[in-house]
Regions:
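Short, highly selective alpha-helical patches that border small-molecule cofactor pockets
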Residues: 14, 18-22, 73, 161, ...
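Gly/Ala-rich beta-loop-alpha elbow adjacent to hydrolase catalytic centers
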Residues: 64-73
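Alpha/beta-hydrolase active-site loop
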Residues: 17, 37-56
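Short, surface-exposed "cap/lid" segments of acyl-processing enzymes
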Residues: 1-39
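Short hydrophobic segments within beta-strands
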Residues: 6-11, 64, 88, 148
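Aromatic pocket-lining residues of Rossmann-like dinucleotide-binding sites
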Residues: 76-80
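Short coil/turn segments at beta-strand junctions that form active-site/ligand-binding loops
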Residues: 2-3, 58-61, 83, 143-144
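The alpha/beta-hydrolase serine catalytic core
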Residues: 81-163, 167-202
Length: 202
């Protein structure tokens, strides 16, 4: 069986991160997706074209996606033929994240609607168009999925990730000392072990 693994990075990441996963998928082709999309509607255009171009000739395609890369993937690739997905610290409720950022920045919905975009002191720009989009197009995902979540994730609550996993029937693994960004030696060891276990049949 000819198998392709597509890796989708998170914010600030790069397609080069796919190299980390190649030893874990020795009998598969592993590629990283160096996407340019900054919004889910841009991803909806860009992601399917990448998938269609690179998945030709493969019997099985596995998706590994990180953080907002997972959100963009679920928004754009739900209708594609994926054998399974593995999400690391996925953003699964973008509306909740945006409203949380609004609360942290003390921005009301009326203010955002009026100004359309508001920059925050912690580097995120709030967008009324973005908020309206995520409300209009909620995530619908039925691909067999496994999720790795850090107990200290500051962007997605335990309640949110557990509820999402239950809703889509995903297997959820929690590393209590893990953060949103898995990067320490211990965290990466847990990630690698989780990937190895996830390769087995779901």
């Amino acid at each position: 069986m000819k198998r392709l693994v597509i890796y989708v990075h998170g914010k600030g990441g790069s397609a080069e991160e796919a190299k980390h996963y190649r030893p874990l998928f020795a009998e598969s082709d592993v590629i990283g997706f160096d996407y340019h999309a900054q919004t889910p509607w841009e991803a909806k255009y860009e992601f399917p074209r990448f998938f269609d171009l690179h998945s030709k000739g493969y019997d099985s395609v596995i998706l590994i996606a990180n953080s907002i890369g997972a959100y963009f993937s679920m928004n754009a690739l739900a209708g594609k033929k994926l054998s399974r997905a593995m999400f690391i610290s996925p953003i699964v409720d973008m509306e909740r994240l945006i409203t949380d950022i609004m609360m942290w920045a003390k921005v009301t919905e009326a203010e955002l609607e009026s100004k359309k975009e508001i920059s925050t002191e912690f580097g995120e720009t709030l967008s009324w168009e973005y908020l309206c989009y995520v409300r209009k197009y909620p995530i619908r995902w039925s691909i067999p999925t496994r999720i790795l979540y850090g107990g200290k994730d500051h962007l997605t609550s335990r309640e949110t990730i557990s509820g999402f996993a239950d809703r889509i029937g995903a297997d959820l693994t929690v590393m209590e000392d893990g953060e949103h960004w898995f990067h320490t030696e211990e965290q990466m060891n847990v990630l690698d072990h989780w990937i190895s276990n996830s390769i087995r049949p779901l």
